[in-house]
Amino acid sequence: RTLHGASLGDSADAFIEWLVALVRERGVDAVLISGDVFDRAVPPVDALARMRRALRELTEITTVILTSGNHDGAARLGLFADMLTPSLHVVTDPEAIGTPVEAGGALVYPMPYLEPDLVRQSLSDLPARGEADLPTPLPRSHQAVLGAALRRVRADLEARRDAGDERPAIAMPHAFVTGAQASDSERDIQVGGVPSVSADLFDTLGDEEPLAHGLDYVAAGHLHRPQNISGASVPIRYAGSPIAYSFSEAGATKSITLVTTDATSVTDIEVVPIPTLRGIAVLEGTMDELLADPDEATTASYVSITVT
């Protein structure tokens, strides 16, 4: 990724080094990456090499669960699944939704980005129309396809709860949840005029009423700004991107989210700031003001300056 032509490769390398050290120090059981590993469907060779190195270092010490986002080419990202290690789970196929990865005493439900036009037939649980053998396609919206995906999660969870399995459940959707704050470095995923999904969808899991014990945490992907989402009983959080990709993210502290669980629930959600190799700053003023009052804190930062 670049910022106005400047490579952010050194910032990515610094983050990976820090993350591996943190995972080792804190004894993290699993690293969840909810999509947008790359910025484009066909990433450059150096980005592929960097990702392979990061996955190799992380899977030596923990489990990694990785899904495809709207920026990623799902088929190309799936190539990482050939890294022969049981500690790496790469989920790019919507048909895999509803099958959890059991990690760290929790049930983790990976959910790759769902493009409505591509999955409204395959994920449909609507009755067949007329004499057709296929189910009726879902409505052309993110709300409809994510709802259908969550019903698959619900079906698996219901069966497990009925069998006495009360382990905490974590979902990994890649979507724009209503109430979230975007930045100008995300790509528009609007379909049918509606880009977002309602937060309470994660309470009901696509049905009318919540389960007695449904999801315990939602590790959402897509937005670059770290933030909690209100509107649901289950905690929903975007960890955000580890590096700022636009000047609209100035002032937002980058972080990762550490989620602690016990045998049945989430017990703690800790936000850990990421050390910044180079910050993002936005300055405004006359040329005289800017020269007369230099901001020492921005010496090593990428700076956007508006001269008035």
Would you name each region that the model predicts?
Residues 31, 36, 51, 69, ...:
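Divalent metal-coordination and catalytic microenvironments
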Residues 43, 57, 68-233:
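His/Asp/Glu-rich metal-coordinating catalytic cores
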Residues 96-105, 234-299:
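Binuclear metal-dependent phosphoesterase catalytic core
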Residues 23-27, 103, 157-166, 263, ...:
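Glycine-rich phosphate-binding loop signature in dinucleotide/nucleotide-binding domains
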Residues 1-54, 59-60:
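N-terminal active-site segment of His-dependent metallophosphoesterases
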Residues 58-66, 299-301:
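Short, surface-exposed connector motifs at secondary-structure boundaries
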Residues 64, 169, 269:
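Hydrophobic anchor at the start of a short beta-strand
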Residues 3, 90, 287-308:
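Non-catalytic terminal accessory segments
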